[in-house]
Curated annotation (Swiss-Prot):
Lineage: Eukaryota, Metazoa, Echinodermata, Eleutherozoa, Echinozoa
Function: Core subunit of the mitochondrial membrane respiratory chain NADH dehydrogenase (Complex I) that is believed to belong to the minimal assembly required for catalysis. Complex I functions in the transfer of electrons from NADH to the respiratory chain. The immediate electron acceptor for the enzyme is believed to be ubiquinone.
Record PANTHER family: NADH DEHYDROGENASE SUBUNIT 1, NADH-UBIQUINONE OXIDOREDUCTASE CHAIN 1
E.C. no: 7.1.1.2
Top-level lineage group: Eukaryota
Assigned protein family: Belongs to the complex I subunit 1 family.
Name by which UniProt lists this protein: NADH-ubiquinone oxidoreductase chain 1
Molecular functions per Gene Ontology: NADH dehydrogenase (ubiquinone) activity
InterPro entries assigned: NADH_UbQ_OxRdtase_su1/FPO
Disulfide bond entries: none
Chain ranges passing through the membrane: 5-25, 74-94, 105-125
UniProt enzyme class: translocase
GO cellular component: mitochondrial inner membrane
A GO biological-process term: aerobic respiration
């Protein structure tokens, strides 16, 4: 029982820095592009634009209100979540000092999981 709890916390401690790094790199990209275009950039929400990144991420998930008429609504709205799940699942197989999952055929599993993103694209219409 404790092994599962430990594995879950190890997984969380690996994925949270990945998500924060993506948010920080998005912040840096927006700031650099803002300075290149001689504008200040979006710095009006929260603590030095960090809250704006999470607001933008949330907006990307709930922004699309127009759905194709022939699309299944459950599959159409579950496709972004499937994309995010697959992307975060692939980070578990990165070669680090103590990987969350250490499998013999992890490269083959990474290739198989990365090919599943096609189904998320098909589900989104």
């Amino acid at each position: 029982m404790y092994a599962y709890i430990f594995a879950f916390f190890e997984l969380i401690t690996f994925l949270v820095p990945v998500l924060l790094a993506v948010a920080f790199l998005t912040l840096v990209e927006r700031k650099v592009l803002g300075y290149m275009q001689f504008r200040k950039g979006p710095n009006v929400v929260g603590l030095t634009d960090f809250c704006n990144l999470f607001a933008d991420g949330l907006k990307l998930f709930i922004k699309e209100t127009v759905k194709p008429s022939s699309a299944s609504p459950y599959l159409f709205f579950a496709s972004p979540v499937l994309f995010l799940t697959l992307a975060l699942l692939l980070w578990n197989f990165m070669p680090v000092t103590s990987p969350a999952l250490d499998l013999q055929l992890s490269l083959l599993l990474v290739l198989g999981l990365s090919s599943l993103s096609v189904y998320a694209i098909l589900g989104s219409g």
